[in-house]
Swiss-Prot record:
GO terms for cellular component: cytoplasm. The gene is hisF. Its main location: cytoplasm. It is found in: Cytoplasm. IGPS catalyzes the conversion of PRFAR and glutamine to IGP, AICAR and glutamate. The HisF subunit catalyzes the cyclization activity that produces IGP and AICAR from PRFAR using the ammonia provided by the HisH subunit. It catalyses: 5-[(5-phospho-1-deoxy-D-ribulos-1-ylimino)methylamino]-1-(5-phospho-beta-D-ribosyl)imidazole-4-carboxamide + L-glutamine = D-erythro-1-(imidazol-4-yl)glycerol 3-phosphate + 5-amino-1-(5-phospho-beta-D-ribosyl)imidazole-4-carboxamide + L-glutamate + H(+). It comes from Corynebacterium efficiens (strain DSM 44549 / YS-314 / AJ 12310 / JCM 11189 / NBRC 100395). This is Imidazole glycerol phosphate synthase subunit HisF. SUPFAM superfamilies: Ribulose-phoshate binding barrel. One of its GO terms (biological process) is L-histidine biosynthetic process. Heterodimer of HisH and HisF.
Length: 258
């Protein structure tokens, strides 16, 4: 058997509160990331990802507190991303209890940040988050047909998405979180072409994100080369459970952790 495919819920956190509404029964406080993290741990999540969407400085301090409290309650790896700009940011998050930190926009502005981080903390702690989309008509083409975006998928970074993933691996990151901005929130399934292209180009693990709508959407992503699958809305609203996703992946002939 190969390595088990990981199933990862993602929570958007703003000033210490979960942003996208959550529809779990009998949760005391559906907006508390720590409560939700616990629930997901109990439901069989292999890892958790927090995305800090707070713009304010206060939000950063609150996030460290959330990470601390979560790390005390759950026993699965926790990745934290959003607004990570420096060695100090990563140091604080890891000290607070994060296992991995994901870096996005700041690495586009200064790619050497990735090598500084992986040398200081180890590749296993550093995830490169890539917000990719198909190059729209009328824009400068990219070799792979996919480009890197910033500002929530609204602006082109002028980089080829596959090339950027290769650069990330060369600079020492341990994992690629590949977000399809075209798929994000559509529930039409993962962008398999994007996944296949990145998978063929790098040897580090790739996490597929963006587009999951049903449990049946997950096995094709794994077939396309995803080592892990990430989703937000469908888990939070109880549309699909982690168990259902694992059942579907296992039924397709892949190993999952139970």
């Amino acid at each position: 058997m190969g390595v088990a495919i990981r199933v990862i819920p993602c929570l958007d956190v703003d000033n210490g509160r979960v942003v996208k509404g959550v529809n779990f029964e009998n949760l005391r406080d559906a907006g508390d990331p720590v409560e939700l993290a616990k629930r997901y741990g109990e439901e069989g999540a292999d890892e958790l990802t927090f995305l800090d969407v707070s713009a304010s400085k206060d939000g950063r301090g609150t996030m460290l507190d959330v990470v601390r409290r979560t790390a005390e309650q759950i026993f699965i790896p926790l990745t934290v991303g959003g607004g990570v700009r420096s060695v100090e940011d990563v140091d604080q998050l890891l000290r607070a209890g994060a296992d991995k930190v994901s870096v996005n926009t700041s690495a586009i502005a200064r790619p050497e940040l990735l090598s500084e981080l992986s040398q200081r903390f180890g590749a296993q702690c550093i995830v490169l988050s890539v917000d990719a989309r198909r190059v729209p008509a009328g824009e400068a083409p990219q070799p792979s047909g996919f480009e890197v975006t910033t500002h929530g998928g609204t602006r082109s970074a002028g980089l080829d998405a596959v090339e950027w993933a290769i650069t990330g691996e060369k600079l020492g990151v341990g994992e690629i979180l590949l977000n399809s901005m075209d798929g994000d929130g559509t529930k039409n399934g993962f962008d398999l072409e994007l996944l296949e292209k990145v998978r063929a180009a790098v040897s580090i693990p790739v996490i597929a994100s963006g587009g999951a709508g049903t449990a049946e959407h997950f096995p094709p992503a794994v077939r396309a080369g995803a080592n892990a699958v990430l989703a937000a809305t469908i888990f939070h609203f109880g549309e699909v459970t982690i168990t259902e996703v694992k059942d579907a992946i296992e039924k397709a002939g892949f190993e999952v952790r139970r």
